[in-house]
Amino acid sequence: MCTEWQSWRSGRLSCELGHEAVGVVVDAAQSNRLKVGDRVIVMPHAGCGVCPACRSGEHIHCTSQRDLLDETGSSSGIGCYAEFLLKPDYLLQAVPDDIETHHAAMAMCALGPSFTAMHRMQVSAQDTVLISGCGAVGLGAIINARTIGARVIALELNPYRAALAQELGAELVIDPRAPDLIEQVRAVSGGYGVDAALDTSNNEGAPAVVLELLRARGRLAFVTWSGSLPVNRITGKGIDIFGAWHWNHDVFAEELLQRVRDARPLLDRLTTHRFAMSEVASAFALQETGNCGKVLLYPGKIAQA
């Protein structure tokens, strides 16, 4: 489960509940890639498959998303809160036998966006990385950074998630409202600021704040949809900026699946709650409190880890 609870809270009608899933192929008409019985990671959205973005594996950035309303009941072909889903085979990634289903599910929003962000920023074990916002995506970013070997500083308001961030390997978690935020970050990053930062907070004011926590010639990535940046500070500090949404299916599938293998103990800590699909309202209510990590939803009976 990801951000769908926000529609539940607001009462906004949506036919797109669920945009990350792992399932089993029950029919594979006209597919040479998959067969009945294969476990697959279900990619979000419904890329056309023919535009330049899709041809390069960047289906999430498709310039002509297919309208699958008639086929799936979802205008963007998501709708994973269901027992069955129709999806083009190029938007399904086979899951190797040695990866458990609940771990494979983490390859989407839990790890995917920040995996791309870390790759684009070329994060290494020598870096100190700041993660702004410790929702499920931000917590997954901590896992990605720690698995790489980087040192992690995190910003988070919610005490539950701040504690979970430390369990996952953040060396220091700071309340972003702290009046001495910049001083605290610089004190643990050589006096100059962090090497790289990722904002996942979706807070309007966060981007400009995070920018000031970077050293000169630092790297900044966003998995968020809110906020703005002062161009004069970007230029003045010589900051490299990246946008990251999801991972390239053609280029990074094997590398991301290996990341899932390497991070399994941390992914188990990240997964804090499991619900049957019939309990989805309770799952939404929990997510609204913020007192959870990654929440898994199961059709029918809850599977045990």
Residue ranges: model-predicted function:
Residues 6-55, 96-99:
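Glycine-rich beta-strand-centered segment in the early N-terminal region that forms part
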